[in-house]
Regions:
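Short, flexible, glycine/charge-rich loop motifs used to bind or transfer phosphoryl groups or to couple energy/partner
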Residues: 12, 38-39, 44, 102-103, ...
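Generic alpha-helical propensity signal that fires on short helical segments
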Residues: 21-23, 28, 62, 67-71, ...
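Conserved protein kinase catalytic core
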Residues: 13, 56-58, 123
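Detector for Asparagine
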Residues: 4, 13, 27, 39-41, ...
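N-terminal metal-binding scaffold of metallo-dependent hydrolase/deaminase domains
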Residues: 1-34
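A generic structural signal for short, solvent-exposed coil/turn residues
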Residues: 14-16, 47, 104-106
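Divalent-metal coordination cores built from histidine and acidic residues
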Residues: 72-131
Length: 131
């Protein structure tokens, strides 16, 4: 099935056409389509980024998993998320961050950018090693 979006507001002006697993964007893209969504009130974007999410793995998977959270993000049009460091272990050193990165690599449905903790254990007393 081929879908066409014409007269739509597009991230970068023009037409947006989904054809054979490719997106064509341009001012004069002409492709026959099974369905044409022609409406100036439609806006088409390549994807959104959420810079504040709580994917609670490792440590709190009963609240949210990387798999469930990123699948939900994908369904909502998000192509990337940035996850907060309130985890166990807290990603305040490379060793702890690696635990999180391994889970992300295994389970994420979209790109995940993890934030490290600024202070050791998120305690607010000693800066973590940010080098």
């Amino acid at each position: 099935m081929k879908l066409s979006f014409t007269r739509a507001g597009v991230y970068r002006n023009g037409h947006f056409v989904f054809k054979d697993d490719f997106f064509l964007i341009g001012n004069s893209v002409e492709v026959s389509a099974d369905t044409d969504f022609s409406n100036p009130n439609i806006f088409v974007f390549p994807g959104f980024v959420d810079v504040h999410v709580h994917l609670r793995e490792p440590g709190f998977s009963y609240k949210e998993t990387v798999s469930a959270g990123t699948l939900a993000a994908s369904a909502g049009g998000f192509c990337a998320v940035c996850t907060m460091p309130n985890l166990d272990p807290v990603p305040d050193c490379l060793e702890n961050l690696k635990v999180q990165l391994d889970i992300i690599e295994r389970d994420a449905a979209v790109k995940v950018v993890p934030f490290g903790a600024i202070t050791v254990g998120e305690g607010g007393e000693r800066l973590s090693d940010m080098e």
